Structure formats: C-alpha cells, structure tokens
Amino acid sequence: MKTCKFILLFVLLVSCWNCAEPELGFEEKVLPDAELNFLPENIRVMDLLAPGYLDAWGDATFTILNNSIGNKLLRYVKALSPNRAFIRFEAIPGEDGLPDMAYAGSGLIRYTGKVLNNDCKDELLFHEFFHVFQNGIERPPRKSVNNELEACLAQYLYSDSKSSSYFAVVIDRDFRPILVALASCIDKRTGYLKEGISYDEFHEKYVAALDFIAKTPPYNGSDWMRDQAGYNEHPFPKLVQLLNQHL
C-alpha cells in the first residue's frame, strides 16, 4: 500500500511539473472535452434571436455562425438559454461619445442606425455577442475596461479569420495598431502566448492597450473599472475558453 501511495504521489508531482510553463508567466490549461459535450449543436439564427429581428441582424448572425470562431462563440451564447431564443435588439438614437452598439444585459443589444449601414456589422455584432458570453444574462454587464479590451481582441481575431480586406473600426483607428500588436502575441489555437513571446513583452502591450481604452470615452467615465490583471495573471479568461477548444 505504501508503495502504491508513493507511486501515485510521484505521478502527481511529475504532472504538476509538466503543466508549469514559466516562460508564459501563467499556467496553460486545456479545457476538458466534457465541457464541449454540453454545448448546443447545429444552431440556427432563430435559435438565438427572439422573433421580430431585422433581416440585417439575421444575416449578420448567419455570417458569424458560418465562421469557425464565431460558431464556437454562439454555441456558448446559446448554452446560456438552451430552451428559448433570447437575443433581442433595440434601436437607439446616436449620441456623441457613446458606442454605436452596446450589450445592455438580459440578452438585449442596443444599436444606432449607423450600424445598419456598416458593411462589417457582423464584426460589431460578434463583439456584443462576446459581451453576452462574458457577462451572461442574469445580471447587468460589468463596466470593465479589461472586459472591453478582451472583447476587442476577440473581435479582431474573428475579423482576421475572415481574411477580408475590410474590417470594422475598433474603438478608433489609432487603436488598431495597438490592438494588432497585442494580438500578435496570442496563439489563435489556444488563447495563450505564442512560442517565443515573453510574458514581459505581452504585458507591456497589454497595458498599452488598456491605457488607450481607459482614456477614451465612454470608458474613461467614473463608473468604469480598469480591472487590470495582476502581473503573471492571464487577463483574458473568456478568450482562452473560446479559442482553447480545438473544435
């Protein structure tokens, strides 16, 4: 019996040692396959969007469903309400300093008329779907600068996966090179850092992106939290959950 206990302890110690990745600054985790088994399959637009949606939103959702990353995201979104379509849309007047789209909680996405004329409206909608994934439907969305950056990064990776020469502006045009620099550190297959990228390099670009958003309206408001991840912590857990599935 003592011999068995010793062997078991040795195996556990070796497993823990192998999981550690000091270069990344945080531990990589492969999510269990069991989690995937609970996600809905073969989702249709009508399974997500409550009746009465505009064709523009139905078409944009269809585009997202037919993209690898987008399909993964919408499977997670659907899992929040397996038995009914719960995503609703509400048109609002445009106001200076406010986003043209925003997730208001409880499955409600608000938008201005300007968005309907955007050729990349699926990317903007993907962004809001990601906020649904982050926040769920049981409580109001958190006003977190870190969450906004994570959604921007997810949107960029979705846009990049389409191999299109057109892309929706994220925050503003000056932010794009900062976002691209941060995205260049991320392994699209896992959500963790690419091989050869040091945590210090990643962290520097992460803070620069966070700083940019934090000074930009409306994210510079007193009701917004910075939520900066601690050093050696991964700041984008939902992005890792989305990408690290190998579906």
Model region roles, listed by residue range:
Residues E123-I137:
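Active-site recognition of the HExxH zinc-binding catalytic motif
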Residues C16-M46, Q241, Q245-L247:
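Bacterial Sec-dependent N-terminal signal peptides
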Residues K143-A183:
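Post-HExxH zinc-binding segment in Zn-dependent metallohydrolases
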Residues I109-L125, P140-K143:
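Short pre-active-site segment immediately N-terminal to the catalytic Zn-binding motif
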Residues I7-S15:
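Bacterial N-terminal signal peptides
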Residues E23-G25, E41-I109, K114, N118:
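Auxiliary, metal-adjacent structural segments of Zn-dependent hydrolase domains
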Residues D187-L247:
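Pan-zinc metallopeptidase signature
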Residues M1-F6:
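Positively charged n-region of N-terminal signal peptides that target proteins for export
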